[in-house]
């Protein structure tokens, strides 16, 4: 199981424990590119950001918050480890039951990129996440990183939930960088072809 439910302490309250992101694991195709998260991408966010634990990235379903002590977030050698003390509410209890059955067993995170790197590998465009701001960590139904143990984020939800004017501008800049990298590679290939002739 990718995410576990543990009952700890005298009151045996359940905790949601897992990895919201794994380092060096590639996402599914995110619309012309894949992402990979590098070690250190969360270092500053874990120290500074006000992070919520949400269900499916939905701000109507808050499971915990690091500033209130109901969410613990740490970056270790494996990835972004989380521990949530969920509220004793009907919807949270229903979620826990679904997780115990194995219906929901993957995680994700909502973020804004502070530093990234684009490159091509084996004909695929890759985006390395080097430094990010965190909004949320979430148990999710549909993650983007199918091959990872914890799976990182729900593609559809992140794009729908976090399209602010700033995000759109950052995405446009990232797309420009990706296209610039593609043009640069094509120019290098053209230069090599010219030298061969």
Name each model feature, range by range.
Residues 154-197:
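Charged/polar low-complexity intrinsically disordered segments, enriched in acidic residues
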Residues 1-48, 161, 170, 180, ...:
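Polar/acidic, low-complexity leader/linker segments enriched in S/T/G and N/D
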Residues 6-9, 15-17, 52, 70-170:
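Residue microenvironments linked to proteolytic maturation
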Residues 49-61, 107:
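Short conserved beta-strand and strand-loop elements enriched in small hydrophobics
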Residues 58-68, 75:
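A surface-exposed loop-and-adjacent beta-strand signature within N-terminal beta-sandwich domains
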Residues 25-27, 60-62, 116-118:
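Flexible loop/turn segments at secondary-structure boundaries
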Residues 26-29, 63-64, 145-148:
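Short helix/loop capping segments that flank catalytic or ligand/cofactor-binding pockets
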């Amino acid at each position: 199981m990718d995410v576990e439910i543990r009952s700890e302490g005298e009151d045996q309250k359940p905790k949601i424990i897992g990895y919201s992101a794994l380092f060096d694991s590639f996402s599914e195709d995110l619309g012309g590119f894949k992402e990979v998260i590098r070690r250190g991408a969360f270092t500053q966010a874990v120290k500074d950001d006000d992070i919520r634990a949400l269900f499916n990235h939905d701000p109507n379903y808050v499971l915990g918050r690091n500033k209130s002590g109901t969410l613990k977030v740490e970056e270790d050698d494996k990835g972004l480890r989380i521990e949530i003390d969920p509220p004793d509410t009907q919807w949270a209890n229903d979620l826990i039951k679904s997780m115990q059955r194995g219906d929901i067993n993957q995680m994700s995170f909502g973020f804004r990129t502070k530093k990234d790197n684009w490159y091509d590998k084996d004909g695929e465009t890759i985006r390395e996440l080097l430094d990010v701001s965190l909004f949320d960590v979430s148990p999710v139904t549909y993650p983007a990183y199918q091959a990872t143990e914890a799976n990182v984020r729900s593609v559809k939800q992140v794009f729908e939930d976090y399209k602010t004017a700033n995000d759109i501008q950052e995405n446009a800049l990232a797309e420009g960088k990706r296209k610039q990298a593609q043009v640069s590679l094509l120019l290098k290939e053209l230069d090599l072809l010219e030298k061969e002739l």
